[in-house]
Amino acid sequence: MQQSPTAGKIINCKAAVAWQPAAPLSIENVQVFPPRVHEVRIKIVNSGVCHTDAYTLSGKDPEGLFPVILGHEGAGIVESVGPQVTTVQVGDPVIALYTPECKTCKFCKSGKTNLCGRIRTTQGKGLMPDGTSRFSCNGNTLLHFMGCSTFSEYTVVADISVVAIERLAPLDSVCLLGCGITTGYGAATITADIKEGDSVAVFGLGSVGLAVIQGAVKKRAGRIFGIDVNPEKKNWAMSFGATDFINPNDLQSPIQDVLIHETDGGLDWTFDCTGNVHVMRSALEACHKGWGQSIVIGVAAAGQEISTRPFQLVTGRVWRGCAFGGVKGRSQLPDLVKEYLDHKLEIDKYITHRRPLKEINEAFTDMHNGNCIKTVLSIP
């Protein structure tokens, strides 16, 4: 196996550091230590900016820890590997995975979920599996984020949290498969496994919601409703294949009542991509009695709870949720990269903004503007 000239050495590089919540990120010189057993060091080339990053930075995330290097939607090149790593090699183009896949824990072996349990405890603490960090800045230990930390020129991840992809794949596009697009597309094609002719409603038309629409089209759904309070999202929804667009602010009746009327009793599938618990209830209650299912994708704020009348469930509606669209990162993500290369999966259309790492705070501002779907960072 070839070796990088920096293998086994501490690398000094640039990273965007979140020193404290609700404060701008700071571009710093950081030290990235060599990978240990079953670890991989990656030269990050591109990273998307996700609402989950903003949520943690806001201080509203009860599991948010500081100081930390955020970012979890990145692609790059393997710089070096630690002992006992066999899944990737130096020079491989890769995507970092915030949802790992060890293939040996009870979750992975069950075949029922993509939620690997192998490193969940340490990942939630912002640490590598051995309980330590690979980042330092000015003598301060920096924490990892979601097992990825892609807002850095170099990062270290567990070998079960990275997957090699085809060398022809442009990293400034496929980096977005590290979270949002995969989450929405997988929710439609894997978690729901929509059948031809099924009726679908998607609440919230950011990148995740638009990806749900793309997945529904892939599965040959019938009527596809895009729902958003931003009227500018209508053109986006229709361009990805929605058949209808509804702005709840334009209605005199609750959105669920309108959808039930429009679909002769309710929808086969609804998807919440907002993280708003009131919208989650509307999405469930818009489902058809007897078989309609609502998939919760959006993450609600701390302390929020969902509620509905039990009769909604007794009469056959189902509430479900998914992370990363139900996609198994190491087993299935390379297939999505191939779909993109074969022009069967759209990625580039989502990219409305591109910025260098030094403009990361502006990228966070972009994200909250109604005309931004996805920003891709070039690193450094």
From Swiss-Prot:
Domain of life: Eukaryota
Residues that coordinate or bind Zn(2+) 2: 102, 105, 108, 116
Reactions listed under catalytic activity: a primary alcohol + NAD(+) = an aldehyde + NADH + H(+); a secondary alcohol + NAD(+) = a ketone + NADH + H(+); S-(hydroxymethyl)glutathione + NADP(+) = S-formylglutathione + NADPH + H(+); S-(hydroxymethyl)glutathione + NAD(+) = S-formylglutathione + NADH + H(+)
Alphabetical keyword list: Metal-binding, NAD, Oxidoreductase, Zinc
GO cellular component term, pick one: mitochondrion
Cofactor: Zn(2+)
Entry-linked NCBIfam families: adh_III_F_hyde
Annotated protein name in UniProt: Putative S-(hydroxymethyl)glutathione dehydrogenase 2
GO term, biological process aspect, one: amino acid catabolic process to alcohol via Ehrlich pathway
